Structure formats: structure tokens, C-alpha cells
């Protein structure tokens, strides 16, 4: 059975349509199964409401071989830190690049340096990436989509549901994922302050750059924003003001909104800041810090 025949068969099984319909949608996207299914449900949203029998997807042997190359010697159902570093190297990705976080989000990594067999195999099977080259090319596109906040890719756990319930992945999803991904244990509730700062140094410039590009803002504006970011880091490491050594998920996720809705709108005066709004205490303390040093 040819690969195109297999893809048509999978399309028919997943959508309950005819071979003719499958061929039409697959040919329009050069036999990219994921895009073909998305396009079908975009044009026929009512079809997504039909309850379909779960389909057991056969995993391509090439994917199994790739996973087995990197799997942990003590636990064959996961890739651990050593295998992950080798995998990233083969993909041409450095661990400190934003692409490594995008890959972790894509493959639903439970924590830093770990990929599970089930997610690795099923997600790459869904996207029809069966070799390192295809995976590398896909990650480049996926990361670009996230960084530019386009939302062109969906959480694959939702794509077979009602189209209105399908969840597009955007940069905020990557940002929030980073917190939980960085925790060392499942029971851990707070992120070490130094770790939080390192990830903010990676993520905040991307938010600034995207906002500046979308709103055609100049270098002077970006310099004002970057100055506020540096003041945020200085505040966090000032033991007189910041007695906590960790960041809660609420503080992490709300700072994203504070940065987009307050800092990026007016980095000089914070004109939209409302001290009566439900910001986490660390944000209120940051504003107090700025006032004390006559920085605001």
C-alpha cells in the first residue's frame, strides 16, 4: 500500500468521508494529513460534532526507530536528559534556544529534558514527520507560528472535537507551559527565582519584538521597554524589596498580562495600571519599588 493510499485511508477513517473527498483535501495540501483534516473541519464545522469511534493509529516503524535511538536505558518509555540533548543536537537546536521550548510544548514534555514514548510517537505520526530532517523543518515552522502569535497550529488533543472547541496554540500557551515544564517535581508549586529570571530573559524580548513589529514601533520605544525589563530583574534580586526566592504560577502567568497590557502600552508612565486591579502582590511591590527610586 502506497503512502498516499494510507493517508487517504486515515483521512476517511478520521472524518467518515469518501475516498474522493479524502483525495480532494489531501491533494490541496500536498498530502499533509493534519492540514487536510483541519481544512475539512473548517469547511464543515457541523461534521466535527459527530461522535466518531476512536481510531487506533498505526505508528510508522521509522518513528519507533528514532525514539529507540534516544530512549532512556532504564526506562524504555521515555527519553531522559541525555537522550534529549542528543536529539536536540541532531535537530540542530541548542537547549537555550526558544525552539527547544517550542519542541517541548509540541511533544507535551512533562518536565525539562523528558519526552514520553506515547506523545513522541503519536504527535510525530499525526504530523507525518518520519525523519530528523522533517522534524527539524516542522519545528522551524511551528516555532515561527508561536513566536508570531499566529495560532496556526492546534493542540492535537482537541482537533477531532467540535471545531469551536479546538484550541489554537499561541505564544501565551508557550509562556505558561514554560513554568510547569521547568518544575523539578509534580508536587512543586513554585519556580526558583533564578530559573524564572533566565526564562523571562528568553521570552520577554520575543514578546517585545512581536509587539513592536505588529505596531510599527521604533527602537526608542523598545529601549524604554527593555529598561523596564531590566528594572524588573533588578527588583527581583533586591533582597530589601523581594524577600521571596521563588515565583508562583499565578505571578508568572499574570506578569505576562501585566507586561502586555501595561508595560508595552506605555513603558514610560504605565498609564493603564490600576492599583485596585487584581494584580499579584509581586507586581504591586514592583510598582512601589519604582516609585521609591523615582523611576516612575
Curated annotation (Swiss-Prot):
<dbReference type="GO" id="GO:0032182">
    <property type="term" value="F:ubiquitin-like protein binding"/>
</dbReference>
<dbReference type="GO" id="GO:0031624">
    <property type="term" value="F:ubiquitin conjugating enzyme binding"/>
</dbReference>
<dbReference type="GO" id="GO:0045116">
    <property type="term" value="P:protein neddylation"/>
</dbReference>
<dbReference type="InterPro" id="IPR005176">
    <property type="entry name" value="PONY_dom"/>
</dbReference>
<dbReference type="InterPro" id="IPR009060">
    <property type="entry name" value="UBA-like_sf"/>
</dbReference>
<dbReference type="Pfam" id="PF03556">
    <property type="entry name" value="Cullin_binding"/>
</dbReference>
<protein>
    <recommendedName>
        <fullName>Defective in cullin neddylation protein 1</fullName>
    </recommendedName>
</protein>
<feature type="domain" description="UBA-like">
    <location>
        <begin position="4"/>
        <end position="41"/>
    </location>
</feature>
<dbReference type="InterPro" id="IPR014764">
    <property type="entry name" value="DCN-prot"/>
</dbReference>
<dbReference type="GO" id="GO:0097602">
    <property type="term" value="F:cullin family protein binding"/>
</dbReference>
<comment type="function">
    <text>May contribute to neddylation of cullin components of SCF-type E3 ubiquitin ligase complexes. Neddylation of cullins play an essential role in the regulation of SCF-type complexes activity.</text>
</comment>
<dbReference type="Pfam" id="PF14555">
    <property type="entry name" value="UBA_4"/>
</dbReference>
<keyword id="KW-0833">Ubl conjugation pathway</keyword>
<feature type="domain" description="DCUN1">
    <location>
        <begin position="58"/>
        <end position="291"/>
    </location>
</feature>
<dbReference type="InterPro" id="IPR042460">
    <property type="entry name" value="DCN1-like_PONY"/>
</dbReference>
<dbReference type="GO" id="GO:0000151">
    <property type="term" value="C:ubiquitin ligase complex"/>
</dbReference>
Amino acid at each position: 500500500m502506497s503512502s498516499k493510499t494510507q493517508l487517504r485511508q486515515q483521512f476517511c477513517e478520521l472524518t467518515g468521508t469518501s475516498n474522493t473527498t479524502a483525495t480532494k483535501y489531501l491533494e490541496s495540501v500536498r498530502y499533509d494529513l493534519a492540514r487536510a483534516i483541519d481544512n475539512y473541519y473548517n469547511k464543515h464545522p457541523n461534521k466535527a460534532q459527530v461522535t466518531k469511534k476512536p481510531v487506533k493509529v498505526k505508528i510508522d516503524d521509522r518513528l519507533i526507530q528514532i525514539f529507540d535511538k534516544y530512549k532512556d536505558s532504564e526506562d524504555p518509555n521515555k527519553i531522559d536528559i541525555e537522550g534529549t540533548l542528543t536529539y536536540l543536537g541532531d535537530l540542530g537546536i541548542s537547549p537555550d534556544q526558544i525552539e527547544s521550548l517550542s519542541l517541548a510544548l509540541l511533544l507535551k514534555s512533562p518536565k525539562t529534558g523528558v519526552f514520553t514514548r506515547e506523545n513522541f510517537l503519536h504527535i510525530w505520526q499525526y504530523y507525518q514527520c518520519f525523519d530528523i530532517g522533517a522534524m527539524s523543518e516542522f519545528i522551524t515552522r511551528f516555532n515561527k507560528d508561536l513566536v508570531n502569535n499566529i495560532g496556526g497550529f492546534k493542540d492535537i488533543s482537541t482537533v477531532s472535537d467540535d471545531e469551536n472547541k479546538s484550541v489554537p496554540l499561541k505564544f501565551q500557551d508557550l509562556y505558561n507551559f514554560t513554568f510547569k515544564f521547568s518544575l523539578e517535581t509534580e508536587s512543586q508549586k513554585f519556580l526558583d527565582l533564578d530559573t524564572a529570571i533566565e526564562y523571562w530573559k528568553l521570552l520577554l524580548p520575543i514578546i517585545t519584538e512581536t509587539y513592536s513589529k505588529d505596531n510599527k514601533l521604533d527602537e526608542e520605544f523598545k529601549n524604554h521597554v527593555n529598561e523596564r525589563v531590566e528594572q524588573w530583574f533588578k527588583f527581583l534580586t533586591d533582597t530589601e524589596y523581594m524577600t521571596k526566592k521563588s515565583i508562583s504560577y499565578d505571578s508568572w502567568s499574570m506578569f505576562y498580562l501585566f507586561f502586555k497590557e501595561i508595560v508595552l502600552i506605555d513603558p514610560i508612565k504605565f498609564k493603564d495600571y490600576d492599583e485596585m486591579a487584581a494584580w499579584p502582590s509581586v507586581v504591586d511591590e514592583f510598582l512601589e519599588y519604582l516609585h521609591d527610586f523615582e523611576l516612575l
